[in-house]
């Protein structure tokens, strides 16, 4: 665990040092849980969004996109339940004056019990080797059985309390489990209370005439209120989907773990509208399709897992998370939910407008059911960096840090490097750069030794480095170096476009989804 925490700190430092992520307003000492994306971060983020957008709207004839406004009529959020129920249960430690989410404190305690069980299993696996039967060990070992029984009892109480919105019971679980404040080490807790997460502001020129509005806490409602607009103007037939990428805002009291949980963040959501009664079959299909999309990135299938929800939101009849193994444990990067017809029904009720679909095949009108896929772009960004960040020791004891990003997502696709700045090599390198830059995001670098320049490109994840040397001036060939293997190949300049295009195009990534 300590090693993973150290790795996470290195990753955060790497993001700042190499222009991926900066603390926002840093010259004013920053703003808690708010970050800016730097010159390489914004390119990686845009490439991720393009991979998702094309995977949805380009590869599916029945999915289209919209871009809804951040400000919406305040009744939208009343209808969706956000005004009354978009809350977090908060608890304060009287000694440290620190505020925590009560549910997160309990979840962290459960995770510690899981770690105890995992350590017991790992020790036994090393002891017994190939003959080890994990299932039998878990069911028969007294220590594991004790930990599991403790965990199950706490989890059952926790689930009941969350479902019943029982704040007193949440506090009692914290007391009974002897959960301490990480800062003060004491158990001097206040009562648990609810805190609404929406940012409110006013729209209008005078205080008396101003309307209270909200920064949207999710992008989904912009899709639901535009259901009829898109369906009618696009002549869409069910099943069909509407996709959107956009900013959302939540007044997170406990924002932590770098860009994993922020107050301003970006979502990629797709709402898929289906016939009532067919939603669970579509939920299963989208569940597998979304996992395939993530694993297609090549970061390792074992790094991903499903986490099915035991506690369902009031509007859902099925829900699962796709989790990725971050340096701080498995965490959600995407949610897939069967939202039933709750959202459209609520907006029909509050707006007084009929929001239904006439199904010509069935000869009847109905309120469609919805399957939602929802990704936090910033979380996805962090998972990609965590999976790509690699420290290597090379022959001769030299080391390097390399971001083994999927080539199609890399911020810079290729770097053009003259071996030296004299004898026309720099001019030749710039000529090659201008030839390629209309199709690829390129970088030119002539400063420092060629080895140091390779290391800089490795650190930002550039898949290819093209070296222009004296042989180039004689026979129009260059050396092309691949980031992951550091292998070098001599190729003619007129083949560069063909070689690089095949390996870094988004198409090469999208074809893996077929």
Q: What is each residue range found by the language model?
A:
Residues 1-514:
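NTP/phosphate- and nucleic-acid-binding module
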């Amino acid at each position: 665990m300590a090693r993973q925490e150290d790795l996470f700190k290195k990753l955060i430092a790497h993001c700042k040092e190499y222009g991926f992520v900066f603390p926002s307003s840093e010259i004013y000492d920053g703003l808690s849980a708010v970050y800016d994306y730097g010159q390489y971060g914004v390119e990686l983020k845009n490439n991720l969004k393009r991979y998702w957008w094309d995977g949805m709207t380009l590869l599916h004839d029945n999915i289209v996109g919209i871009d809804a406004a951040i400000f919406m009529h305040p009744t939208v959020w009343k209808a969706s339940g956000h005004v009354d129920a978009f809350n977090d249960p908060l608890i304060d430690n009287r000694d440290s004056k620190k505020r925590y989410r009560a549910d997160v404190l309990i979840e962290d305690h459960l995770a510690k019990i899981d770690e105890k069980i995992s350590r017991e299993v790992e020790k036994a696996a090393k002891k017994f080797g190939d003959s080890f039967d994990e299932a039998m060990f878990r069911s028969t070992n007294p220590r594991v059985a004790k930990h599991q029984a403790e965990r199950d009892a706490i989890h059952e109480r926790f689930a009941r309390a969350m479902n019943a919105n029982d704040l007193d019971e949440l506090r009692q679980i914290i007391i009974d489990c002897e959960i301490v404040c990480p800062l003060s080490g004491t158990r001097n807790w206040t009562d648990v209370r609810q805190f609404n997460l929406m940012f409110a502001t006013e729209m209008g020129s005078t205080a008396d005439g101003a309307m209270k509005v909200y920064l949207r806490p999710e992008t989904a409602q912009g899709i639901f209120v535009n259901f009829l607009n898109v369906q009618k103007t696009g002549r869409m037939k069910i099943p069909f989907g509407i996709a959107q990428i956009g900013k959302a805002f939540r007044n997170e009291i406990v924002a932590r773990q770098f860009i994993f949980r922020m107050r301003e963040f970006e979502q990629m959501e797709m709402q898929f509208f289906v016939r009532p009664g067919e939603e669970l079959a579509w939920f299963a299909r989208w569940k597998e399709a979304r996992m395939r999309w993530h694993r297609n990135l090549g970061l390792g299938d074992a790094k991903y897992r499903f986490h099915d929800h035991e506690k369902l939101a009031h509007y859902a009849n099925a829900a699962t998370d796709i989790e990725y193994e971050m340096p701080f444990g498995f965490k959600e990067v995407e949610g897939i939910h069967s939202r039933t017809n709750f959202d459209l029904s609520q907006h029909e009720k509050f707006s007084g407008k009929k929001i239904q679909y006439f199904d010509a095949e069935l000869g009847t009108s109905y309120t469609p059911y919805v399957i939602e896929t929802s990704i936090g772009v910033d979380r996805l960004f962090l998972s990609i960096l965590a999976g790509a960040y690699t420290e290597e020791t090379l022959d001769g004891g030299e080391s390097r840090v390399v971001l083994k990003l999927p080539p199609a997502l890399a911020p810079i696709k290729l770097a053009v490097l003259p071996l030296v700045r004299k004898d026309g090599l720099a001019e030749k390198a710039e000529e090659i750069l201008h030839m390629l830059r209309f199709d690829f995001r390129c970088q030119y670098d002539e400063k420092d030794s060629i080895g140091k320049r390779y290391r800089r490109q490795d650190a930002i994840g550039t898949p290819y480095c093209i070296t222009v040397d004296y042989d180039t001036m004689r026979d129009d060939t260059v050396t092309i170096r691949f980031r992951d293997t550091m292998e070098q190949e001599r190729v003619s300049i007129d083949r560069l476009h063909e070689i690089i295009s095949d390996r870094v195009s988004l198409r090469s990534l999208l074809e893996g989804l077929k």
